[in-house]
């Protein structure tokens, strides 16, 4: 159709203005450009972002725009960007437009879905709350995840967000036999590469679909990759009735790329230079991550916190949507305790006796009280020393130090760094161990025996070995 052809009238970095003779493409419609750069044939996908008046549109490029010139031919697709869905996407890596980028045989999809879809309606959504066991002690005990809930992993650079995500993918594949979708939103290419090979080595690759829009790509690709991954997860939920795990690393980059796109489209920025539509854009993505009567999408989103400032508009806009927060703390990482989850800052909506049962709730709040008391006593200890404390406070400090150590755990995906085999700890074992510490059952065991182990049984074995050596 000649009418659906247009031409480039302006190229502004990743933004391209296109004019059509008699056709006006809809917002979110895909446009295709086939061109040649230095004798190499290239194709580029654009997505319509704004109507400029007349038959002119402003579109965001999903790849680099080098080599584009004015008056070049552009073809409208008449539909949105569509990506492959179904079991054939498992074990493969895709870019934002659904092309496989893992150097394997190109995928010829039998089914594709558009990346912009409506969120499930109120009637379709499920209101049932169930705990999702992760096998990670500190999470299951103090900030449990709910099936079909949204979890934020908060932390600055280099405190271990990606390692926790990899461990969760591992545990879901091995223990729950479930599918996962991983969306790499504006993160390091090296990390994406490492993740792929580690999953291949760990034998979990056939249970996960990977979608990457990395740091070096234009903002359009970094922003829309979250929708590409989500669409693949929605298929497993809606058509197959499965419980899927959706990982987004990093949701901050989704907001950041939205800010870049907004500025390029000429919108006036709001606080801290973010886009004026930040809350709406975040809601559009988050509302699609939901549990329906068919299946669920449980999502874990790593949230980079710029300069460790939780009041920054980007992390603040994510907070509103979360059911649980897992906050990583650099001070805990500096003590050598991994995962460096802050037991007092991390929260969960389901940490209540009605949702998780009286026993779990009592142990969790008991642990938090001991840790809080220890935190309050630290100023006194720093000034006067441990000897000035009452006998009861000394006991609290001893138990708190054991709890801190026992909250550490060797991960399967970190075996290569730590040399310790990974451990999956069931909720039952976790409650037994921490309940015993609170009751004073293990007051006679040295605190070093609690460090980097799985269940309390291992603590007792380690203490026995320490005594004998």
From Swiss-Prot:
Locations listed in the record: Cell inner membrane
Domain of life, per lineage: Bacteria
Keyword check for Membrane: yes
Subunit-structure text: F-type ATPases have 2 components, CF(1) - the catalytic core - and CF(0) - the membrane proton channel. CF(1) has five subunits: alpha(3), beta(3), gamma(1), delta(1), epsilon(1). CF(0) has three main subunits: a(1), b(2) and c(9-12). The alpha and beta chains form an alternating ring which encloses part of the gamma chain. CF(1) is attached to CF(0) by a central stalk formed by the gamma and epsilon chains, while a peripheral stalk is formed by the delta and b chains.
Protein name: ATP synthase subunit beta
UniProt keyword list: ATP synthesis, ATP-binding, Cell inner membrane, Cell membrane, CF(1), Hydrogen ion transport, Ion transport, Membrane, Nucleotide-binding, Translocase, Transport
Catalytic activity annotation: ATP + H2O + 4 H(+)(in) = ADP + phosphate + 5 H(+)(out)
Organism ancestry: Bacteria, Pseudomonadati, Campylobacterota, Epsilonproteobacteria, Campylobacterales
């Amino acid at each position: 159709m000649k009418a659906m052809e247009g031409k480039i009238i302006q190229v502004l970095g990743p933004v391209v203005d296109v004019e059509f003779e008699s056709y006006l493409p809809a917002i979110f419609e895909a446009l295709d450009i086939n061109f040649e750069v230095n004798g190499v044939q290239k194709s580029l996908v654009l997505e319509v972002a704004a109507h400029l008046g007349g038959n002119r549109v402003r579109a965001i490029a999903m790849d680099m725009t080098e080599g584009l010139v004015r008056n070049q031919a552009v073809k409208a697709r008449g539909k949105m960007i569509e990506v492959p869905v179904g079991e054939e996407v498992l074990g493969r890596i895709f870019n934002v437009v659904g092309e496989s980028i893992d150097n394997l045989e190109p995928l010829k999809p039998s089914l594709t879905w558009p990346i912009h879809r409506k969120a499930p309606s109120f009637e379709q959504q499920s209101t049932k709350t169930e705990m999702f066991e992760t096998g990670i002690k500190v999470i299951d005990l103090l900030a449990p995840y709910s099936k079909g809930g949204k979890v934020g992993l908060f932390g600055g650079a280099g405190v271990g967000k990606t390692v926790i995500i990899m461990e969760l993918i591992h545990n879901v594949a091995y223990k729950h036999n479930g599918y996962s979708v991983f969306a790499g939103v504006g993160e390091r290419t090296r990390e994406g590469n490492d993740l792929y090979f580690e999953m291949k080595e760990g034998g979990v690759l056939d249970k996960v679909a990977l979608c990457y829009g990395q740091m070096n790509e234009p903002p359009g690709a970094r922003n829309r990759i979250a929708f590409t991954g989500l669409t693949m997860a929605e298929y497993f939920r809606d058509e197959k009735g499965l419980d899927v795990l959706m990982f987004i690393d990093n949701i901050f980059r989704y907001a950041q790329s939205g800010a870049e796109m907004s500025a390029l489209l000429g919108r006036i920025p709001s606080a801290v230079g973010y886009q004026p539509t930040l809350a709406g854009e975040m809601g559009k993505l988050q509302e699609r991550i939901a549990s329906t009567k068919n299946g669920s999408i449980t999502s874990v989103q790593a949230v980079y916190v710029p300069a460790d400032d939780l009041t920054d508009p980007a992390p603040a806009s994510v907070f509103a949507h979360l059911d649980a927060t897992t906050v990583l703390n650099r001070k805990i990482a500096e003590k050598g305790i991994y995962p460096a989850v802050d037991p007092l800052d991390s929260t969960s909506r389901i940490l209540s006796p009605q949702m998780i049962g009286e026993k779990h709730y009592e142990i969790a709040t008991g642990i938090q009280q001991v840790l809080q008391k220890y935190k309050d006593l630290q100023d006194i200890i720093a000034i006067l020393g441990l000897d000035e404390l009452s006998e009861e406070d000394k006991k609290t400090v001893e138990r708190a130090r054991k709890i801190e150590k026992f909250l550490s755990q060797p991960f399967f995906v970190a075996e290569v760094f730590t040399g310790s085999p990974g451990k999956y700890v069931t909720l039952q074992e976790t409650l037994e161990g921490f309940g015993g510490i609170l009751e004073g059952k293990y007051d006679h065991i040295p605190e070093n025996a609690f460090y980097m182990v799985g269940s309390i049984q291992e603590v007792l074995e380690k203490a026995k070995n320490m005594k004998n050596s």
